[in-house]
């Protein structure tokens, strides 16, 4: 499970929504009373606009973040076009959400902010101070959170809820993990170009996609820049990243990709197109490295041996008191105290009689806040107080192991992997269709803006 850490989450929200939360500015509002232009339009998106100021602000934020991370900053014209394209997609989605009547009330936003704070082991007031210290006004951050929730709810309604995974797909997935590639333990770093051509498309459309794919394959094999080819032509969700998957375990890749990569050396492009049920793929192996996988033939789940001390809030115990008490206990344990004895004495959970020991926990068996904190700990490490719906926890990880789990758990893991892959592709297709049916006019003077 992804860990919600302060820096990445705050930066993500600030980048994603600080420019979406501004309501579309009507053209007649862009001039001052004296006729002097105070802002100009970068793009018209249906019945709204993206202003040059919004675009420049987002570019400034992204540039600052890249500089802080010592990451290369793309040429300004290239960055501007990429940022504007993303803003157009986001604006179209927000307009669609409004049409669908999707709204996020204040209570939901507040609960989300509280969960973000709790995930970082902070009170909401301290969390707010940290955000504002990064130069992001709290009103902007709150608006950004509302935007992210809106887009998430829209995707759930329009895409994720419609993705289905059949039992046959699950069986085939598990069988593929038991096939000739099941023993591979090398993580694979790939690049790919995807051209959509589902099996139920017309023969004309399939042939056109195949011709284009063959032409791109010839360019890639001839030494053309693969990243540029992917950015310009791929219809996959990662096209903007040059089709770069990063290092991925073979179990999380389509079996066709793994089979192709097994015969390639780093830097080589698969000599043939890969035909999938969704279209045509061109695959290039960037590199491989020793992975974390095993040669076992079944999907794995990571179980965690964990114990905790729970203090419930209420009945004379306030939140500050609970946090302070657990911090005191943590300090005493660090000084040589026995965790199990403290759990037996203080914990208000049923596990107190076992010294707080919960045994081996599988993913999804605890509340999200507990699981996120648990997953962030190293073996033997003790957390700071963690807030959940039950109160405050002091958590210690005792060990981890891989387990095949039950047949039902294996099937659930397979269903999740397939569903996630299908949802990402369905979302990319839906976004593309949404973009194709929208009226978008990019102002011609944009390219001359510095």
Swiss-Prot record:
Signal peptide positions (record): 1-27
GO molecular function: peptide binding; peptidyl-prolyl cis-trans isomerase activity; unfolded protein binding
One protein family per Pfam: Rotamase
Keyword Isomerase: yes
Protein's GO biological process: Gram-negative-bacterium-type cell outer membrane assembly; protein folding; protein stabilization
EC number: 5.2.1.8
Domain PpiC stretches: 185-287, 301-399
Subcellular location: Periplasm
Gene3D superfamilies named among the record's database cross-references: 3.10.50.40, Porin chaperone SurA, peptide-binding domain
Domain of life, source organism: Bacteria
Keywords: Chaperone, Isomerase, Periplasm, Repeat, Rotamase, Signal
One of the record's GO cellular component terms: outer membrane-bounded periplasmic space
Transmembrane feature ranges: none
Region feature (Disordered): 230-249
Keyword Lipoprotein: no
Catalytic reaction list: [protein]-peptidylproline (omega=180) = [protein]-peptidylproline (omega=0)
Summary of the function given for this chain in its UniProt record: Chaperone involved in the correct folding and assembly of outer membrane proteins. Recognizes specific patterns of aromatic residues and the orientation of their side chains, which are found more frequently in integral outer membrane proteins. May act in both early periplasmic and late outer membrane-associated steps of protein maturation.
UniProt free text on domains: The PPIase activity resides only in the second parvulin domain. The N-terminal region and the C-terminal tail are necessary and sufficient for the chaperone activity of SurA. The PPIase activity is dispensable for SurA to function as a chaperone. The N-terminal region and the C-terminal tail are also required for porin recognition.
PANTHER family associated with the record: CHAPERONE SURA
Protein name in UniProt: Chaperone SurA
Organism: Paraburkholderia xenovorans (strain LB400)
């Amino acid at each position: 499970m992804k860990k919600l850490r302060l820096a990445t989450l705050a930066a993500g929200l600030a980048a994603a929504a600080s420019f979406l939360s501004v309501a579309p500015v009507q053209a007649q509002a862009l001039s001052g009373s004296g006729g002097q232009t105070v802002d100009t339009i970068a793009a018209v998106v249906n019945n709204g606009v993206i202003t040059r100021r919004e675009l420049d602000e987002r570019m400034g934020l992204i540039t600052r973040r890249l500089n802080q991370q010592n990451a290369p900053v793309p040429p300004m014209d290239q960055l501007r076009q990429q940022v504007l394209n993303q803003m157009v997609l986001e604006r179209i989605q927000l307009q669609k959400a409004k049409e669908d009547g999707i709204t996020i009330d204040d209570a939901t936003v507040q609960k989300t902010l509280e969960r973000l704070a709790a995930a970082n082991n902070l009170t909401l007031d301290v969390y707010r101070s940290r955000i504002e210290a990064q130069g992001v006004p709290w009103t902007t951050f709150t608006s950004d959170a509302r935007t992210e929730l809106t887009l998430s709810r829209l995707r759930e309604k329009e895409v994720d809820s419609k993705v289905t995974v059949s039992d046959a797909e699950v069986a085939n997935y598990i069988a593929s993990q038991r096939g000739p590639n099941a023993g591979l333990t090398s993580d694979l770093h790939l690049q790919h170009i995807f051209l959509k051509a589902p099996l139920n498309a017309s023969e004309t459309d399939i042939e056109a996609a195949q011709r284009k794919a063959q032409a791109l394959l010839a360019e890639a094999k001839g030494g053309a820049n693969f990243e540029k080819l992917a950015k310009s032509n791929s219809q996959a969700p990662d096209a903007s990243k040059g089709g770069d998957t990063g290092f991925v375990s073979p179990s999380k890749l389509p079996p066709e990709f793994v089979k192709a990569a097994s015969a390639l050396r780093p830097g080589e492009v698969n000599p043939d197109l890969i035909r999938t049920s969704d279209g045509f793929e061109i695959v290039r192996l960037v590199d491989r490295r020793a992975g974390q996988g095993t040669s076992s033939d079944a999907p794995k789940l990571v179980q965690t041996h964990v114990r905790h001390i729970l203090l419930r809030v209420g009945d004379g115990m306030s939140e500050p008191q609970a946090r302070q008490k657990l911090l005191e206990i943590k300090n005493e344990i660090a000084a040589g105290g026995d965790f199990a004895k403290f759990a037996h004495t203080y914990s208000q959970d049923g596990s107190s009689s076992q010294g707080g020991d919960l045994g081996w926990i599988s993913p999804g068996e605890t509340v999200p806040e507990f699981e996120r904190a648990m997953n962030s700990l190293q073996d033997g490490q003790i957390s700071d107080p963690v807030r959940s719906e039950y109160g405050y926890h002091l958590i210690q990880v005792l060990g981890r192991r891989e387990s095949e789990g039950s047949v039902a758990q294996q099937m659930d893991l397979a269903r999740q992997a397939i569903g996630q892959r299908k949802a990402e592709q369905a979302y990319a297709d839906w976004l593309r269709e949404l973009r194709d049916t929208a009226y978008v006019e990019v102002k011609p003077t944009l390219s001359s803006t510095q």
